[in-house]
Amino acid sequence: MADKRDFYEILGVSKSATDAEIKKAYRQLAKKYHPDINKEDGAEAKFKEVQEAYEVLSDSQKRANYDQFGHAAFDQGAGGFGGGFSGGFDDFGDIFSSFFGGGGGGQRRNPNGPMKGQDRFMSMRIDFMEAVFGANKSVTLNVDEECTSCHGSGAHSKDDIKTCSRCGGTGQTVTQQRTPFGVFQSQATCPDCGGSGKTITKRCGECHGKGFNTKRVEVDIKIPAGIVTGQQLRVSGKGERGANGGPNGDLFIEIVVGTHKHFRREGNDIHINIPLSVIDATLGTEIEVPTVHGDVKLTIPAGTQPNTKFRLREKGVQDLRSGRMGDQYVEVKLEVPTKLSRQQREHLEALKETEVKGDSVFDRFKKAFK
């Protein structure tokens, strides 16, 4: 059997990584290799490898054991605990359980308790207007749902569920080895019951003993108005299957918002550039400006300069939390004609003649340097 890879190496973090760094690395890798997203060969194996690493490193006690003993802390038959004691402890199983996370006084952590399933991650691309006003979307997923026939037990009836004879219902087996250095003891999941502490004499005919059925379901996703790229939506119970009757994990959907041809969003404000002729900027005019809420009349005062910005109050995006509306900013971009008719040129030449009598714009500019 090939050696297992180092769990820290799998997640791409250092051995001094914080819980937050480990969780962040896991989420990124889980999204990258999830079988529902990544169809490449080997992706599913990598996904399982990432899950196994996170299961250990996200648990402070398991992580401490792993840091001290490596994979041997969880492999059956390995020397996970060095004793070297000649007496004073009658029950080495209790010592081992206490060392590996059980309570004191002979109380062990129940390995058969309900465990929530792993969360599932995916991304969803929506267009600009869907992010502004919200939308209703749907995704199709494979979801493990509790068998309605056996209610998750996997057995044909309650009488077909028996306490595992190998582990006595604990779900764990303990192996002891005596060496010249003392007693080495390890604990592993029971191979007969798979850690459940129960065995089934007759399986459920509906789910064939699994306790669940995999279904292809369509999940409705409500996109709230005002959402931005990077924000996540959570759908409860649509993640990976839980263990020992525990609930399913959750589905997290990271939103990616597309760009718009004309509008640009900054926070809850919308920005747009509008073309304006030199004549309209000089004499002033009234125009209808596109907004995400429809056209709005805007008065351009005479003498408007290039790149002037006008503010349209509450014509932006609704804030996701407070509900307040952002604004829209309209920036003027002057368009200088490249071709003129004879009549237009004559009018402009006449206008230029009136300017020559005084200082031109450029003349006033030069005087500022003297």
From Swiss-Prot:
Domain spans labelled J: 6-70
GO biological process: chaperone cofactor-dependent protein refolding; DNA replication; protein refolding; response to heat
Cofactor binding comment, as recorded: Binds 2 Zn(2+) ions per monomer.
GO cellular component: cytoplasm
Broad class of where this protein is predominantly found: cytoplasm
Signal peptide (from-to): none
Alphabetical list of SMART domains matching this protein: DnaJ
Cofactor: Zn(2+)
Zinc fingers classed as CR-type: ranges: 134-216
Induction, as annotated: By heat shock.
Residues where Zn(2+) 2 binds: 164, 167, 190, 193
Any matching Pfam family: DnaJ
Keywords attached to this entry: Chaperone, Cytoplasm, DNA replication, Metal-binding, Repeat, Stress response, Zinc, Zinc-finger
Residue sites binding Zn(2+) 1 per the record: 147, 150, 204, 207
Single Gene Ontology MF annotation: unfolded protein binding
PROSITE patterns to which the protein is assigned, alphabetical: DNAJ_1, DNAJ_2, ZF_CR
Cellular compartments annotated: Cytoplasm
CXXCXGXG motif repeats: 147-154, 164-171, 190-197, 204-211
NCBIfam families found in the cross-reference section: DnaJ_bact, PRK10767.1
Subunit: Homodimer.
Domains (record comment): The J domain is necessary and sufficient to stimulate DnaK ATPase activity. Zinc center 1 plays an important role in the autonomous, DnaK-independent chaperone activity of DnaJ. Zinc center 2 is essential for interaction with DnaK and for DnaJ activity.
Biological role stated in the UniProt entry: Participates actively in the response to hyperosmotic and heat shock by preventing the aggregation of stress-denatured proteins and by disaggregating proteins, also in an autonomous, DnaK-independent fashion. Unfolded proteins bind initially to DnaJ; upon interaction with the DnaJ-bound protein, DnaK hydrolyzes its bound ATP, resulting in the formation of a stable complex. GrpE releases ADP from DnaK; ATP binding to DnaK triggers the release of the substrate protein, thus completing the reaction cycle.
Family: Belongs to the DnaJ family.
Protein name: Chaperone protein DnaJ
